[in-house]
Amino acid sequence: MQSEATRVASLPCIAVTAGDPAGVGPEVVRAALSSPDLARGFRFELVGEQEVSFKSGVPTARGSGWAFAALEAAVAGALSGKYAAVVTGPVNKERMKEVGFGFPGQTEFFASRCGVKDYVMCLTGGPLCVGLVTAHIALSEVPSLLTVREIEKTGLLLAAFLERRLGRLPRVAVAGLNPHAGRAACLVQRRPLSLVPPSSD
């Protein structure tokens, strides 16, 4: 008969990084890992040096170096097969740049380390999964980057991901740049922004 320790050891392991040690990440991670609602079909491993002390609310380059090292360890473990997935806490992007983190965000970091060129940041809650056409850029830059090609690429990547996850083709909708402005965009600009639906190309 299989022992409980053996059964637990055989479960897929998910790596968890706390993010910036001076931020909200460590507190949220501790609460999540002790929650009775935590998925029981997995093991969770907190990645990163544990015997460290940082002042809450005061992000530093040292703390970001700690967070960066945890990310590197987590992605290395995932690529080696040690971890089935990685969950990350939030980092301080300004301080991360000071320690050589040359990415706009963690999404781009993982894409680079995994050698992935085409990827989409997804936000999932309940039955809804949202794929972002743009991310980690200034809002003023969004209109110039919202092209038919980028919308189509994001939609196809999102659909492929959801098909693997759900086992069926999903329904994909495209939200406007400013959905609150109405169909004619009359609230915010004199000239409507035209986006040709990818399906018509």
Language model segments and positions:
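A glycine-rich helix N-cap at a beta->alpha junction
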Residues: 107-117
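Conserved beta-strand scaffold positions in the cores of enzyme catalytic domains, especially
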Residues: 46, 119-121, 130
